[in-house]
């Protein structure tokens, strides 16, 4: 079975320090880890200080339906309130090198 890849870049404001963002992301990651269909997640931080997206989350889900159910839940919606601008999208792998 193939998994689907979530790529979610975050536009973290300059006045928000990394620790504050990481704390919120950690709570959301713990919740997602408990949801059906979640496979794994990795959070990446930009090396360049001028990057538009300071953090990018890359996660795997068993299906788009599992992901949608997780993000539409009232628990996740409450956690996501106040999250910096982000642009989540699901992808499927089409080539591997």
Across the structure, where does each feature detected by a protein language model lie?
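Short amphipathic alpha-helical segments
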Residues: 15-43, 75-83
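Glycine-rich beta-strand-turn "strand-cap" elements at beta-sheet edges
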Residues: 1-4, 42-53, 79-97
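Short, surface-exposed, polar/charged, turn-prone segments marking secondary-structure boundaries
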Residues: 33-38, 59-61, 67-72, 82-89, ...
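Short, well-ordered beta-strand segments in beta-rich or mixed alpha/beta enzyme
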Residues: 3-11, 42-73
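A generic signature of intrinsically disordered, low-complexity regions enriched in glycine/proline
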Residues: 12, 19-23, 61, 96
């Amino acid at each position: 079975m193939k998994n689907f890849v979530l790529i979610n870049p975050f536009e973290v404001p300059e006045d928000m320090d990394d620790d504050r963002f990481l704390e919120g992301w950690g709570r959301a990651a713990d919740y997602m880890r408990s949801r059906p269909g979640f496979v794994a997640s990795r959070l990446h931080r930009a090396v360049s200080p001028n990057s538009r997206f300071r953090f990018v989350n890359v996660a795997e889900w068993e299906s788009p339906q599992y992901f949608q159910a997780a993000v539409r839940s009232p628990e996740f919606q409450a956690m996501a309130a106040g999250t910096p601008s982000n642009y989540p999208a699901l992808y499927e792998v089409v080539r591997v090198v």
